[in-house]
Structure formats: C-alpha cells, structure tokens
C-alpha cells in the first residue's frame, strides 16, 4: 500500500512548523544560543584588539629604548656639533640625559581635556579643604562661645552667692551697731511683702528699685563689700572681723574673691 503524500496545505502540517515571521519572539533555547554566540564574537574582537594594542606598545617601547645610531642624520649632526653619546644636554652638562617620554593619547577627549580635568579636580579638592577648615573654625568658635557662656553663667551664680552672703552679714553687723535701716535697701536681704509694706513707703521703694536695677551684681558686690570693710572691718571671703585697718591690711589678702584663691 502506497504511503499517502503529506498535505502541505493541511492545518496539522502548518502548525508543526516553527513560526519564524519577522517580529515574532524566538524560542528561549534558540535565543540563548544566539546571544551566547554574539558575546563570544564580541569577546574575540576585543581580545584581538587588545593583543594588537599590546604588540604595538611593545614595538613602540622597544624602538624608543634603542639609542640612535650614527646612521641617524639628526644624531650625526649633533656629533658634529660636539655632542658625545650619553652626555647630558646643555653648556654645563647638567641637562637631561634620557629623552622626554612619549605620552600616547588613547582616549577620545580633545587636546587639553585631561589637563583641564586634573585642574578641576585640584580646585575641587582645594575647595573641599577650605570648607573643612571653615567648618572646623566654626565648630571651635561655637565651642569657645559655649565655654564663655558657661563661664559667665557660673561667674554670675558665684557673684549672686557672694552678694547674698554680704547682705546677710551687713544686716547682722548693722544690727549689732543698732543701725535699724540699711544705707541702701539692697544692702540687706529682701524682706517679705508684708514686712516691706509695713516698713517702707511705696514711692521710696520705687526710686530705690530704679537705682538697684541700674547696678549689676558685680557692682553691688563691690559697693557692699567696700561698705563692710570700711564700716565694720569685715571681709566676707575671710569670714573675719578685724580689730583695725592695720590688722585687716596685714592679714586680709585683698578685697576681691580672686585675691583669696
């Protein structure tokens, strides 16, 4: 029985064929093989190009390292002018001996681009250094300002403590001498509101407050300690009442806290 001929127009035959129409995606295995082959070709081309560059460089370096012979017209002319092989250039013989190396440009950038790029990098580095220095200076200045503020704050606390101590001593010593009213309202510690209403007139208080507000803590301390030393021969830092001026002059270091440190 004769085999039936295939019907090339049948759906079964057409569906069995691979669809290779333009624009249709290839099977995954075929695509991978194709990409692998392309990468292999590219690698071979790059290797050949690299080998060619290496060969050219080797030949160039070999030629450049060879000394010029007498057959070279330029070298022969130098010899006629008195130059000897291996001699340094210049009248004094202190010039270069080796030729200036040849710098082969392989990039696509224009002439002067590398120099400009190098200069730009140096400028950026210098700018970065300046910023670092400025930041360091600002940080040091901020630290100094903070230390000064803390020092001023501690100093103000100490001055207020010394003033309070002086006010209490003044009230006690004035009382021992039957002085019932302080020379200035702030010479003594502040009384509570009830005592103040009973002891002082409102207008007088307002005038004294104005004077008090004009004085700093340091100024008040200087005035009050001077009063205590002159009126009562008392030093708050020594904590001593002296017998007379001579006794105070001989035994008290001075009229400030620093003198007693």
From Swiss-Prot:
Listed Basic and acidic residues bias regions: 29-64, 111-124
Pfam families: DUF4187, G-patch
Coiled coil ranges: 31-65, 190-222
One annotated GO molecular function: nucleic acid binding
Alphabetical UniProt keywords: Centromere, Chromosome, Coiled coil, Kinetochore
Main subcellular localisation: nucleus
Region (Disordered): 1-67, 88-124, 184-213
Subcellular location: Chromosome, Centromere, Kinetochore
Entry keyword annotation includes Aminoacyl-tRNA synthetase: no
Domain G-patch as annotated: residue spans: 70-116
Family matches, as InterPro entries: DUF4187, G_patch_dom, GPATCH11
Record field: compositional bias (Acidic residues): 194-213
GO cellular component, one term: kinetochore
Family that this chain belongs to: Belongs to the GPATCH11 family.
Name the UniProt record assigns to this protein: G patch domain-containing protein 11
Organism name: Xenopus tropicalis
Taxonomic lineage of the native organism: Eukaryota, Metazoa, Chordata, Craniata, Vertebrata
